[in-house]
């Protein structure tokens, strides 16, 4: 068996914190296209969305430090335990972990960072009640006010997953950039091809 461990927002666009924009629809269509091409040796593990478990949906943009301040670390450990149990019991010959560039939880090599003391925590409740159009108009303002920035490093979940599984000889790590979806889709497709050799 080969195992594809993938962020749920790459399969369905509706987990995206502010609600989907066109790029999320395109990304999920591309990823589902690759999944449809997998042979019977592959199994898909789309773990529970850690951000949804912590804050429900929708939520305003925030950094990994803000997520940690709100209690994300317990959820991350629970999800990593779940993934680890599957890996231990199923013993896949190949594991491909797929995350999302810039995500505070599922960023593989790139995440979002800020000082959690600068964050407007009251925006969480306000954002929840906004309609989609209002959310899409206001999320950039929250990014600016909170001084959220994209940095090198892993999101909270992928930091935990890498600590536990990066030494496995059969594990590979891919980060999908929703702003450059063609490159990410091609990287994933190439890794899948390599497993057939």
Language-model features, listed with the residues they occupy:
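Short His-Asn-centered micro-motif
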Residues: 6-8, 100-101
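Residues lining hydrophobic/aromatic ligand-binding pockets adjacent to catalytic sites
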Residues: 2, 11-30, 46-48, 136-140, ...
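Short catalytic/ligand-binding loop motif for oxyanion handling, primarily in non-cytosolic enzymes
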Residues: 13-15, 54-56, 103-109, 113, ...
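Short, surface-exposed acidic-centric catalytic microdomains
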Residues: 20-66
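Catalytic phosphate/metal-binding cores of nucleic-acid and nucleotide-processing enzymes, i.e., regions
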Residues: 115-117
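Short, well-ordered beta-to-alpha junction loops that form the rim of enzyme active sites
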Residues: 97-104, 178
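Structural motif
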Residues: 3, 94-98
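Divalent-metal-activated hydrolytic enzyme cores
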Residues: 55-64, 69-87, 122-197
């Amino acid at each position: 068996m080969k195992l594809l461990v993938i962020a749920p927002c790459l399969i369905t666009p509706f987990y995206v914190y502010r609600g989907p924009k066109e790029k999320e629809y395109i990304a999920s269509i591309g990823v589902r296209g690759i999944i449809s091409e997998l042979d019977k040796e592959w199994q898909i593990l789309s773990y529970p969305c850690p951000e949804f478990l912590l804050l429900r949906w929708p939520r305003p943009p925030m950094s990994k430090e803000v997520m940690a301040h709100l209690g994300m670390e317990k959820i991350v450990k629970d999800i990593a335990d779940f993934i680890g149990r599957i890996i231990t019991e199923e013993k896949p010959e190949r594991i491909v972990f797929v995350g999302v560039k810039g995500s505070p939880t599922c960023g593989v090599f790139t995440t979002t960072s800020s000082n959690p003391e600068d964050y407007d925590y009251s925006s969480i409740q306000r954002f929840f009640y906004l309609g989609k159009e209002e959310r899409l108009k206001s999320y950039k303002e929250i990014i600016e006010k909170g001084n959220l920035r994209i940095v090198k490093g892993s999101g909270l979940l992928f930091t935990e997953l890498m600590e536990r599984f990066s030494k496995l000889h059969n594990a590979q790590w891919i980060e999908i950039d929703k702003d450059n979806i063609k490159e990410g889709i091609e990287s994933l497709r190439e890794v899948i091809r390599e497993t057939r050799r």
